[in-house]
Amino acid sequence: MDSTTATAELGWIVHPPSGWEEVSGYDENMNTIRTYQVCNVFESSQNNWLRTKFIRRRGAHRIHVEMKFSVRDCSSIPSVPGSCKETFNLYYYEADFDSATKTFPNWMENPWVKVDTIAADESFSQVDLGGRVMKINTEVRSFGPVSRSGFYLAFQDYGGCMSLIAVRVFYRKCPRIIQNGAIFQETLSGAESTSLVAARGSCIANAEEVDVPIKLYCNGDGEWLVPIGRCMCKAGFEAVENGTVCRGKGRSAAGAHWQLGGQAGKGSGLELTARRSVARLSQSSRCSAS
């Protein structure tokens, strides 16, 4: 899911209605996108929630969330009360189908699972606004294991002045690869950032396993690690194309002979010349002997 690709309103659910508001905004390249903003800093006891639509898990075990946002510096707001915040909370809720309503799940931690409190590295002031200076923060968080069909994300504001510019949800996987003479299929990363998921390889054509069963491990960043075992070309074959193909050793030579010899059943010019030379040599030998 990538909110920046939306061509119409995102239509996420807000609670209460006086909290988050969907507006047209701009990304760091000044492209028009749909964003959400909230700025109720002069009212105490804020508890504003924003919930995404249902996001399907698609087999992933660990979910990554990239957030781009801007936050107003509380000290730059005149007469702002001490309740002004420069952070917000990220939550998720798992479900087997799109079951959420305006009141379910309840707008609170438990049933929602808190991922983290998100803080800005940079905040903007009134001076930045006047000069149209964009100070966009990018933060990535992950959570898992997830096991149900999908999930929702929620963003909780409790007294800040901020704009949620973009949200991208993704998972990591190790790509299909040929290594050590074996094919390893695409493999999803594990449920934890430190997980190593074992993947069994299958030998390429005309190759066979040697020593121990061949495997690779997919780490949490979608990278292949720790190769174990290997496949080697069978007798009569050799590895070519960086070890991705086992080719018959005589195939290249046979092809070269076919090109020199011309079409099957017909002698080439080289062959005819050679035969005539041999015939002349035989005649010369007979004449000398007589």
Where are these regions (language model features)?
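Extracellular glycan-recognition surfaces and repeat-rich motifs
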Residues: 1-37
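Conserved N-terminal submotifs of small, disulfide-stabilized extracellular modules
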Residues: 20-27, 34-42, 107, 112-146, ...
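Short beta-strands within extracellular/lumenal beta-sheet-rich domains
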Residues: 37-66, 75, 136-141, 164
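Extracellular beta-strand-rich recognition modules
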Residues: 63-69, 149-157
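Short amphipathic, basic-aromatic surface patches that mediate peripheral association
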Residues: 69-80
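Short coil-to-beta strand junction motifs in C2/discoidin
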Residues: 78-91
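Basic polycationic patches enriched in arginine
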Residues: 251, 275-276, 280, 286
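Leucine-biased recognition of intrinsically disordered, low-complexity hydrophobic segments
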Residues: 260, 270-272, 281
